[in-house]
Each structure stands twice: as structure tokens, then as C-alpha cells.
Amino acid sequence: SASKGSGGDLNNGKIRVSKQNGLSDSMLGYSTSKITNKEYEYDFNQTYKELSNQNLSIRNSGSIALDLSYIATGRLDGMWAHGVKLWDVAAGLLIAQESGALISNFKGDPKYLDADHFVCSTPKVYKSILKSVKPYFKKLG
């Protein structure tokens, strides 16, 4: 659990994100949706391809809430997701953030709650994931 400004905790003990130093040997999660958004285009396959060419593991648990909890407890080093609904991710994002994760939308804007996409990870993995997502995300209009 977590409350803003108080950190994350599990079974009365403080939790923190992993101390992973970079993408190499990290474990990432993802969530994707076939729902189209009229405000942007995003090529998930290109991001996946770029990241999978690194020395890391990528998985999809099928549960964004579980993945965010795993980031908060150091079991997963980061994730990227698009096509999400705020009510599905808000609590998990707060727990991850309070446990030391960095979070933004795909453009790097920390106002991720206004978007249906985000990157969430340990501080030293964050920029690498964002760098792999950004080129394939394009605002329309």
C-alpha cells in the first residue's frame, strides 16, 4: 500500500524499486491494447523489437496492477503500457512512485494521469525505456 508522500509498504515493511543500473539484465513488463486513440499513433511492435534486441527479459503478466506492484517491490525493473484506463492503473502507479519509480507519459511528461500510456521504472532504467518508446509515438493533429 502507499499514500502520497509516505512511501510504499508491504506487510508493515518499506518497499523500494530494484537497484538495477541499466537495461542490461533487466526484466521489463508491458501492456498493450488494440484500442485506437484518435490523438496519437503508436507502433508497439517497433518498441518491442528494439527492446528485445537488448540483453534483457520482457514479459506480459496480463495484469498491469501486478506489474506495477512488482516494480514497487523490485521484482520487475520497469514497464511501458498504452491503451490503459486511469481506474485500472492509478493505485498501482502511486505505489510504484512512492517506492521510488519514475513515471511519465510516452513523451516524458510527468503528467501521465492525463494520458492512456505511461513508462514506469527504476530511475536508472527509465530513460532507456523512454528512448525506445518515444520514436514510435506520434501525436496527431
Region spans (language model):
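AMP-binding (ANL) adenylation modules
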Residues: G108-Y112
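Acidic donor-binding loop at a coil-to-helix junction in glycosyltransferase catalytic cores
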Residues: L86-W87
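Short, structured beta-strand-loop surface elements
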Residues: N105
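Short, hinge-like loop/turn segments at secondary-structure boundaries
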Residues: G78, Q97, T122-P123
